């Protein structure tokens, strides 16, 4: 942070302190080059593999479950013999998808379509020149046990870990789900159900949905005796494409009309929600299927509804372009009155709600003709936002309510700067708090916006840490905590109890930066990120930091640990973080990129003053064609057992530890 700017902030802090009560088949040479490139990036992708296990800093594992698949090709899928039988679910309650919900005719730049002609007209506004893309059997089961093995247990009535969420009460899909008695593991083309009720973990069943070579399984949800699997697929379709553009309106280099046959690999991208009856875990039964157009973007589960968000590119190209513009949801064309359109829209953002009591159809849907949006979903509303870089860096935000699964547009607004962190946007009591970074000028600038229920500005704090960027954020009660970074990592605290007058409280500086912040009980805030060279900003290791935030005016660093690893899954994907504040545990996977590349799962315990290493489980990558990275390595718990799951392309390993004996 520049010294002058820091002094200005110190003055603000001093003045405020007087008035405030603290309240995620390559050649070796190519792989090595890719590893080197990734090592120097702030955000990383994936890598890695294998079953070799080394234990450090803890007693041996009490049990190991390895499920390996035999002869298997990456693009080959299960046969029809592997498909579960289809059965109907008993429906005790339904929601009428034709229920009338009053819709606003205008929100910001969006206008509610009155007919399909309004939709076609909006698509036609876009030039043709801007074409873009929218978007085996079990071989062995074996166990390794020792004297530290956990005692057999019945149906779990104790605590178990859940997916680490962005918003409490708003569930998110993941590659593994845990209900305390069973683990549900998504691995390439199948979902495996594992019984973890006693020490001898065992595979109960394996679900292999019907897939084509272009289908992929993405995420899971579990709700009592129902398992929900999200898959995405696309068809390569042959279509006669004829341009009706003229020289005057075509800037692509093609003059006049042309006619050709083209293969569109993304011509029909779709997202499918599969529902399985798992009341008999050993015999899952497919009970319902709901398909909607668009590439999967995100999903959430709140109460009795799953909300699906997809997007797809639209254009006027093709002989039957009008038929392609209107998406299908559960076998029906989207209603004209559910479209919000704007000039020059190039992408359809499609929202659908699915009642868990009737998952073969959508309870409601809405389509935005736009240019693509990211999703933030609070307990009261959905916010779709996108960054724009024309005429300055800014973020457009559209707000929708979703009460009882029914969508209703509320408002749209634009703020300066871009949202750089998932947790920089947060809803509380209908109001929205946003931290943005504007890096269009010579010195980047950060802002904190406080918006009311109609997205009107209530308060604004500007000129935050000029020359730095927002790396991580967390809103706890009436305090906004956030990390900015250039060469050092200040943690800031801002009082937002009065939205009209946000006030800076305190800050504390350290080397490196945190990419993820997590509340860790009373007066503590956990930071997961990287240590860096203060002069070059080059990453030198994974860093774990505990902040004392009991007095937001006088923030302190209680302890930090630097680990000699190149990448941390939790720093890039919050779902990869395991946090148990009751036991003081924090777990995550790392990657190291050397001549021998490997993943490592690490578990630390906070003892009140420092971090103590409990698990360091190393898995070396061996087969390049089955390589997976640290984001496929997860920590979970049920009762007094801790599990390390490593999902690979053709198998997965599951290792358990007895926390009562070993921690």
Which residue stretches match the model-derived regions?
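Single-pass transmembrane signal-anchor helices and their membrane-water interface zones
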Residues: 25-39, 55-86
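Low-complexity, intrinsically disordered/propeptide-like segments
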Residues: 4, 9, 29, 38, ...
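N-terminal non-cleavable signal-anchor helices
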Residues: 8, 21, 32, 63-67, ...
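Disordered, charged N-terminal biogenesis/targeting segments of membrane/secreted proteins
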Residues: 1-49
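N-terminal export and membrane-targeting signals
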Residues: 49-55
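Beta-sheet-rich non-transmembrane sensory/scaffold domains
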Residues: 27, 79-663
């Amino acid at each position: 942070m520049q010294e002058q700017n820091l002094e200005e902030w110190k003055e603000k802090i001093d003045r405020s302190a007087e008035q405030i009560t603290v309240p995620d088949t390559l050649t070796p040479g190519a792989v090595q080059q890719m590893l080197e490139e990734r090592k120097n990036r702030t955000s990383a992708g994936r890598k890695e593999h294998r079953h070799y296990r080394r234990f450090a800093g803890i007693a041996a594992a009490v049990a190991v479950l390895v499920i390996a698949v035999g002869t298997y090709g990456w693009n080959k899928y299960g046969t029809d013999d592997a498909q579960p039988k289809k059965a109907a679910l008993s429906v005790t309650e339904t929601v009428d998808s034709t229920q009338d919900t009053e819709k606003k005719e205008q929100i910001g730049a969006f206008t509610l379509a009155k007919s399909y002609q309004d939709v076609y007209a909006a698509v036609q506004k876009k030039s043709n020149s801007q074409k873009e893309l929218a978007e085996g059997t079990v071989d062995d089961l074996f166990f390794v046990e020792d004297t530290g093995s956990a005692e057999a247990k019945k149906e779990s009535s104790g605590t178990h870990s859940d997916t680490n969420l962005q918003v409490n009460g708003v569930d998110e899909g993941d590659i593994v789900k845990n209900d305390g008695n069973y683990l549900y593991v998504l691995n390439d083309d199948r979902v495996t159900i594992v019984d973890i009720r006693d020490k001898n973990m065992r595979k109960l069943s394996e679900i292999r949905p019907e897939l084509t070579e272009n289908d992929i399984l993405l995420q899971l949800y579990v709700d009592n005796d129902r398992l929900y699997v999200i898959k995405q697929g696309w068809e390569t379709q042959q279509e006669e494409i004829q341009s009706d553009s003229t020289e005057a309106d075509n800037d692509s280099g093609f003059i006049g009309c042309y006619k050709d046959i083209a293969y569109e690999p993304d011509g029909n991208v779709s997202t499918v929600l599969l529902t399985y009856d798992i009341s008999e875990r050993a015999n899952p039964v497919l009970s319902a299927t709901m398909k909607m157009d668009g590439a999967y973007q995100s999903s959430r589960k709140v109460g009795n509804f799953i909300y699906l968000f997809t997007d797809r590119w639209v254009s006027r190209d093709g002989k039957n372009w009008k038929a392609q513009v209107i998406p299908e949801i559960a076998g029906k064309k989207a209603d004209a009155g559910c479209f919000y359109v704007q000039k020059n829209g190039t992408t359809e953002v499609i929202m659908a709600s699915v009642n868990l009591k009737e998952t073969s159809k959508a309870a409601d849907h809405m389509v935005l003709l736009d240019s693509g949006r990211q999703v933030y979903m609070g307990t009261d509303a959905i916010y779709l936002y996108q960054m724009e870089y024309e005429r300055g860096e800014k973020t457009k935000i559209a707000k929708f309510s979703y009460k009882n699964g029914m969508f209703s547009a509320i408002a749209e607004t634009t703020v300066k700067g871009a949202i750089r962190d998932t947790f920089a946007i947060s809803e509380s009591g209908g109001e929205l708090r946003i931290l943005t970074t504007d890096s269009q000028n010579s010195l980047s600038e950060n802002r904190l916006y406080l918006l009311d229920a109609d997205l009107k500005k209530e308060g604004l704090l500007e000129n935050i840490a000029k020359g730095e960027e927002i790396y991580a954020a967390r809103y706890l009660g009436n305090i906004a905590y956030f990390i900015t970074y250039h060469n050092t990592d200040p943690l800031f605290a801002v009082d937002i109890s009065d939205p009209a007058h946000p006030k800076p409280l305190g800050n504390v500086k350290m080397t490196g930066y945190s990419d993820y912040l997590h509340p860790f009980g009373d007066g503590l805030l956990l930071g997961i990120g990287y240590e860096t060279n203060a002069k070059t900003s080059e990453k030198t290791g994974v860093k774990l930091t505990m902040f004392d935030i009991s007095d937001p005016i006088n923030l302190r660093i209680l302890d930090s640990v630097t680990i000699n690893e190149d990448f941390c899954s939790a720093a890039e994907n919050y779902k990869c973080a395991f946090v148990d504040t009751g036991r003081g545990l924090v777990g995550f996977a790392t990657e190291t990129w050397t001549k021998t590349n490997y993943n490592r799962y690490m578990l630390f315990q906070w003892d009140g003053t420092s971090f103590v290493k409990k698990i360091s489980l190393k898995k070396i990558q061996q087969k390049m064609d089955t390589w997976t990275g640290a984001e496929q390595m997860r920590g979970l718990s049920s009762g007094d057992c801790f599990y390390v799951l490593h999902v690979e392309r053709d198998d997965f390993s599951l290792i358990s530890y007895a926390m009562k004996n070993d921690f």
